[in-house]
């Protein structure tokens, strides 16, 4: 990368990211704990002010232990399931199912109107 003009804003860990959000009064953010197949210790970096939900299922698999750890630690979080294919095809199962043995997930938000603001507001409510 040739442009380093904003390098001072880079965050190299979730803890740094949450600190930056707090320092800059950034509360209108969407952050989900996400598992890429390996165990992730959410006790090391969880901030309930910003991380309102945890991704428990994706085309990478189902990671129930993530929400079990959250509940054991007393975290109050929502549950989301995503495709995680980075292709803009919500709920699509190909190629994830062939590679990882799981079909991508979908998340439901109960809102009064189908609008970005309503969905974001809903995502911040447990």
Q: Predicted segments — roles?
A:
Residues 1-126:
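Extended, charged catalytic domains and RNA/DNA-binding interfaces, predominantly
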